[in-house]
Amino acid sequence: MDKSSIRVLVVEDYEPWRRYFSTALQKQPELQVIGEVSDGLEAVQKAEELQPDLVLLDIGLPTLNGIEAARRIRKVSPASRILFVSENRSADIAEEALSTGASGYLVKSDTGSELLPAVKAVLEGKRFISASLAGHFLVTTALSTTQTVLQWTVILISGMR
């Protein structure tokens, strides 16, 4: 990805947040906000038309929620990376959002300190989770890993009999 021309589509229905995101991103010389939209259907259409490198996507959108919009964007613009920004702190919602193939989930109240690191991480092909949700994901991953190890242990012991 050419660092001098990273193209971003901002999808946010609340105008003050949309303006904040666009302004913060435009201050970065390597980022170019190529579009701003305020609803889910419009997001899908613009993503198909513009093929952005990054879609900054709210969840609570009119006409089509952000999670469904992300699923559709993945189909019409598969190379676009998606970073969710939401007021919702629910780990279940974050998991559902990430299950769409999105690269990150950022809680809006954390954007002051995390917006640019999140964008950078996502553009580098990494995953990003807001610090306020990270604990949940660490516990879930640890439990999942422990369960997998236990399952393999049972299989190995069973095979030894």
Predicted feature descriptions by range:
Residues 58, 86:
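Active-site residues of response regulator receiver
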Residues 89-92:
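Conserved phosphotransfer active-site motifs of two-component signaling proteins
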Residues 67-79:
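Short amphipathic alpha-helix used as the core "switch/output" element in two-component signaling
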Residues 30-38, 46:
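Short hydrophobic/Thr-rich beta-strand motif most characteristic of the beta2 strand and flanking loop
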Residues 39-42, 65-68:
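Acidic catalytic/metal-coordinating carboxylates
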Residues 94-99, 104, 109-150, 157:
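Short, flexible helix-to-coil linker/hinge segments that flank and couple to helix-turn-helix
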Residues 12, 153:
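Conserved acidic carboxylate
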Residues 14-18, 129, 158:
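Short acidic/polar segment at the start of the alpha1 helix of CheY-like receiver
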